[in-house]
């Protein structure tokens, strides 16, 4: 089953975050994303022609995030939006983060 076919499940905490090796294995499924140096977050910078296009993309990401009840951090500027995803409750990465990344990718930039 592909990540886009899955649904984020609520994380109640008490679950260990993925280690670097697990995260790198999951990253293969969302190859445009990068792992931060601590392996606690994935991120991707999307480029656009202008601010309006970037904002439109962020609004579409918001709809997906609300539907999945999993919310990324987003940096927005002229011609770009950077999406950063982690599971805050466990201060690291969970399968949910990669599911959301795949669904953001499916929006097309």
From Swiss-Prot:
Gene Ontology terms describing biological process: tetrahydrobiopterin biosynthetic process
Pfam families: Pterin_4a
Catalytic activity: (4aS,6R)-4a-hydroxy-L-erythro-5,6,7,8-tetrahydrobiopterin = (6R)-L-erythro-6,7-dihydrobiopterin + H2O
Residue ranges of the TM segments: none
Keyword Nucleotide-binding belongs to the record: no
EC number: 4.2.1.96
Similarity section: Belongs to the pterin-4-alpha-carbinolamine dehydratase family.
Name listed for the protein in its UniProt record: Putative pterin-4-alpha-carbinolamine dehydratase
């Amino acid at each position: 089953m592909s990540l886009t076919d899955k649904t984020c499940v609520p994380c109640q905490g008490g679950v260990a975050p993925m280690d670097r090796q697990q995260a790198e294995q999951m990253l293969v499924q969302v190859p445009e994303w990068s792992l931060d140096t601590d392996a606690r977050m994935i991120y991707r910078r999307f480029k656009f022609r202008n601010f309006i296009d970037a904002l439109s993309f962020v609004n579409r990401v918001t709809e997906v995030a609300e539907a999945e009840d999993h919310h990324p951090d987003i940096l927005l500027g002229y011609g770009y939006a950077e999406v950063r995803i982690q599971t805050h409750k466990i201060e690291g990465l969970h399968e949910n983060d990669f599911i959301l990344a795949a669904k953001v990718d499916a929006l097309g930039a």
